[in-house]
């Protein structure tokens, strides 16, 4: 099967492993841009459980840079490739501070930022930050609404459960900053349908993707989607590097972008080979 021209490919882990060092990160970012990747992605964990405990896939000593700082660095070393957070754990952030940081990065990158957000899943991380784990879904909804208000309203004002403000301004306001919501809960699917430009599924195979998209369709039948948002863009990080046939099958399910995650622990040479392999096997 042929991979549709409309499908795009992102590169994950741009703030980890070889990309947690400046020289390697800059070289891999430029290589990915030249290879035809449409986007670079960075995830987030402020802290990791020690000792490692399920469901954390990362060891306590694994290095992971702050995604916004990493993407700002990558923006300075690239020109056209988009820059995505995959994902920001939104309820762990101050929404107005985050809104300012995101608007700044979007401005400095020339409008290349894609904001991926999720509610988080590591209770020890929330406990260390002093944020109630049980409130994370409600906080995410509240924070998204507050950020949209500060970004879009001529005289921003918002009064919610966890954040309230009026009589303030914050510029620059992004012209168009797409928002993807991640997660596999009923709330995550509702959040995507009601107010996001896209949905992001992580570590899914074809069957898992089909199941998730069925649940998104069910959510779309239950919740109203503003016409201004248009079609929901679907991004998926597959469990492993797909071949052309598998990529085409993802596209046939309705996936618009595959965000590819290299195996953990690759050095710069091996990551260079990975990018070149993707270019030959999927992009060109």
Model-derived features: positions:
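Active-site-adjacent structural elements that line small-molecule/cofactor binding pockets in enzymes
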Residues: 1-284
């Amino acid at each position: 099967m042929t991979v549709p021209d409309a499908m795009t490919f992102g590169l994950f882990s741009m703030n980890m492993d070889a990309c947690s060092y400046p020289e390697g990160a800059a070289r891999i970012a430029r290589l990915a841009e030249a290879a035809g990747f449409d986007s670079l992605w960075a995830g987030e964990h402020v802290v990791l459980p020690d000792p490692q405990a399920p469901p954390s896939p990362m060891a306590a000593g694994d290095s992971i840079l702050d995604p916004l700082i990493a993407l700002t660095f990558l923006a300075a070393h690239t020109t056209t490739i988009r820059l995505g957070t995959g994902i920001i754990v939104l309820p762990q952030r101050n929404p107005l501070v985050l809104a300012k940081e995101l608007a700044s990065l979007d401005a400095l990158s020339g409008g290349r930022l894609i904001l991926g957000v999720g509610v988080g899943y590591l209770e020890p991380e929330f406990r260390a930050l002093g944020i109630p784990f049980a409130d994370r879904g409600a906080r995410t909804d509240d924070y998204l609404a507050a950020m949209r208000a500060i970004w879009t309203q001529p005289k921003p004002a918002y009064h919610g459960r966890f954040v309230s403000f009026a009589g303030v301004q914050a510029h620059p306001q992004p012209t168009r900053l797409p928002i993807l919501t991640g997660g596999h809960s009923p709330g995550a699917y509702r959040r995507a349908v009601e107010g996001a430009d896209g949905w992001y599924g992580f570590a899914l195979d074809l069957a898992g993707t089909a199941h998730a998209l069925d649940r998104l369709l069910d959510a779309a039948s239950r919740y109203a989607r503003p016409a201004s948002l248009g079609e929901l863009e679907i991004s998926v990080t597959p469990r492993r590097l797909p071949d052309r046939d598998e990529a085409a099958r993802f596209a046939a399910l309705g996936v618009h972008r595959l965000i590819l995650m290299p195996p953990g622990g690759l050095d710069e040479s091996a990551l260079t080979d990975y990018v070149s392999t993707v270019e030959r096997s999927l992009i060109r």
